[in-house]
């Protein structure tokens, strides 16, 4: 998924798999072409796409390079969300985005973060409300900033895709707050 500076979804990146890894490619489609069916992991996400010739040039699917960069193929003013590093406003790294949870209204509700270092014994996965995430310009691209402090991150419950989702939210005064997200587990995109 890519988002703009306001956090609005713009494109969804789809991995088209080839045969035994040969022919794999990633293609980005405009967000407005997708329909989300409420119901969770086993419900389909539908790509409602007319013939390419009927689409405006800006709405046509685009091939995306298969590189390790989270910004590869992102349009100017947009940021690829999955695998993006998330920082605090002071530049300290918080973690890495591993998933985005989409609500019934087809809007991002929460971001799933892998927090802690690779060898950190406190490494875990948490969900943070989408409202805690901001996007700020940096070096001609966008960076993801999280408005949560250490206490909020440590107090946040672990994320489990098969359990009710408790997403940590920014709270006045810096007190930890976990609020149920309206997204369903498994609404991975």
What are the residue ranges of the model-derived segments?
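Peripheral interaction segments used for macromolecular assembly
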Residues: 1-189
């Amino acid at each position: 998924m890519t988002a703009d500076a306001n956090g609005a979804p713009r494109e969804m990146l789809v991995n088209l798999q080839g045969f035994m890894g040969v022919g794999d490619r990633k293609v980005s489609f405009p967000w407005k072409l997708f329909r989300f069916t409420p119901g969770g992991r086993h419900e389909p996400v539908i790509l409602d796409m007319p013939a390419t010739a009927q689409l405006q040039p800006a709405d046509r699917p685009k091939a995306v390079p298969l590189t390790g960069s989270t910004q590869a193929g992102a349009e100017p003013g947009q940021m690829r969300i999955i695998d993006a590093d998330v920082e605090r406003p002071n530049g300290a790294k918080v973690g890495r985005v591993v998933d985005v949870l989409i609500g019934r209204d087809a809007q991002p509700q929460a971001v799933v973060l892998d927090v802690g270092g690779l060898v950190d014994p406190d490494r875990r996965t948490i969900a943070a409300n989408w409202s805690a995430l901001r996007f700020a310009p940096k070096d001609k691209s966008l960076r993801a900033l999280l408005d949560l402090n250490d206490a909020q991150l440590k107090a946040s419950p672990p994320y489990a895709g098969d359990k009710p989702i408790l997403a940590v939210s920014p709270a006045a005064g810096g007190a930890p707050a976990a609020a149920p997200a309206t997204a369903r587990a498994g609404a991975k995109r």
